[in-house]
Design a protein with these regions (language model features):
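Intrinsically disordered, low-complexity regulatory regions
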Residues: 1-181
């Protein structure tokens, strides 16, 4: 593994650790309340976060005092929640413990890492030459694709499914987080 690839993996792991720490704290405060979210609501939550990033990038000003970094963290965590919900389905009430939620979170985070490693090899660190605003636009595009796939009830002809789009959202958001560090 080249030094650049190794650095990317280390930065990715560090960013994911930051996201996991916040996820664990929110699990403590709220429990796995997100288990109630239906797919369309989760997609809209991702949209709100990405749209706010784009708005802040364009306006260069936040009136609520939070910047772009927390929104990338939210995209990563909600992306992982999305993967969990795809696997488990939504529930009427939270039906897993915080420990179970963290174990599943870790599994999905590792799947995202492994995908990033494979893609980073094939794309040869291209993400490092990209603008953060491009990650934002790509994330918004992925969210729009998820909406379309949801609207046709997953009956795609040639496209990847919702899970692949969530993975890409997570990875682009991690790249954004790294670039803003």
């Amino acid at each position: 593994m080249s030094k650049d690839y190794q650095k990317t993996e280390e930065q990715f792991r560090s960013a994911m650790a930051e996201c996991r720490a916040l996820f664990a704290k929110k699990l403590h405060d709220y429990g796995p309340s997100w288990r109630i979210l239906r797919p369309s609501s989760l997609t809209d939550q991702l949209f709100i976060k990405a749209k706010r990033i784009r708005s802040l990038e364009i306006k260069k000003e936040s009136l609520v005092g939070e910047g772009i970094r927390p929104e990338f963290i939210a995209l990563i965590n909600y992306g992982i929640v999305g993967l969990i919900q795809l696997e488990m389905g939504f529930a009427d009430t939270p039906d897993i413990s915080a420990d179970e939620a963290l174990a599943i979170y870790d599994k999905k985070a590792d799947e995202a890492l492994q995908l990033m490693i494979r893609k980073n090899h094939d794309y040869d660190e291209a993400w490092r030459s990209m603008r953060v605003s491009s990650y934002t636009d790509f994330i918004l595009t992925k969210i729009q694709r998820v909406k379309e796939i949801e609207d046709i009830h997953g009956a795609t002809l040639v496209s990847e499914g919702i899970d692949a789009n969530y993975m890409d959202i997570i990875n682009y958001a991690v790249f954004g987080l790294i670039k803003l560090s």
